[in-house]
Curated annotation (Swiss-Prot):
GO terms for cellular component: cytoplasm. The keyword S-adenosyl-L-methionine does not apply. The Q motif is unique to and characteristic of the DEAD box family of RNA helicases and controls ATP binding and hydrolysis. This is ATP-dependent RNA helicase eIF4A. Residues 55-225 form the Helicase ATP-binding domain.
Amino acid sequence: MATDKGLEDVPEGQIESNYDETVDSFDDMNLKSELLRGIYAYGFERPSAIQQRAIMPVIKGHDVIAQAQSGTGKTATFSISVLQKIDPTVKSCQALILAPTRELAQQIQKVVIAIGDFMNIECHACIGGTSVRDDMKALQDGPQVIVGTPGRVHDMIQRRILKTDQMKMFVLDEADEMLSRGFTEQIYDIFQLLPQSTQVVLLSATMPQDVLEVTTKFMRDPVRILVKKDELTLEGIKQFYIAVEKEDWKLDTLSDLYETVTITQAVIFCNTRRKVDWLTDKLQARDFTVSAMHGDMDQTQRDLIMKEFRSGSSRVLIATDLLARGIDVQQVSLVINYDLPANRENYIHRIGRGGRFGRKGVAINFVTADDVRMMREIEQFYSTQIEEMPMNVADLI
């Protein structure tokens, strides 16, 4: 596959767009009528910035690199493109979508199924932590779209259970995250096992060297689309901080907040799994109802907790960054960073949840003396202001 040297001279891990056409209505994209029906039924009215720019080149068959964060509508961008390109009458895998976490893969699967509701297609999630036998059975039925995590997908292709001969499109979502989690080898292997003619679509919030290497090795003359940070979703989200002198005082601060704020639904982020468990125990001991979720839990447990949270029967979810990218709960109006994220890129993944697509939200950051520098960095990185939390914060939620 051809290399694209132009990508290597990019400043600060940001790609340069080389494609600027926009289509600002779904009706003007020449989509199948059943697909269009699914898009509107899903609740979309007009395309977001990335959808206006990226859907058309993908549908036209170009390899596409899109740099965009969560909350920009990127999942629907490639879901719509995939659904437009596949042939529902052919019962075999025509599109493969890889994601870094099981939660994200399942979320993508839900979007594909919902938007493709009138199209008579099958979409199967091929993820670790589930029964291999069930996977094999589902794959033998020939679902047109597979969404999965690299380990399990690689395994199924190697066992020749997932057949790739009809593959038209390969989508890598959150490529930076997948490569930083050590999936590089499996991803390279999967590329080698796909037909030469497979179209490649890569989405990534950042463009570190390892992502650029994938694009140069496996993509042909790609269309590059950068959705700049100012089009992203900190807009509409009120961001505050509470100065907490010592780490030990955070728990009391959180308990006081619980009293003040009768929260609709909230996610509280901690930086480690142990901290999540510790905080959950402490809050439950104080008779607060909270649920917790992190990567040490098995899949069944995680699914159950997400289900309870989505349905509203559990109100407060304590989680690690692993889940910042997999939680898409429309009614979350409050995010609390009990710990500031260890890297600034994760800040938008955490709080971009609360205000997606113009929904309002509030983010409250607990900031110790040691965190002040990181908070300033976050403000600078996102060109945003995080202000001290006012007394009447309850009125804002």
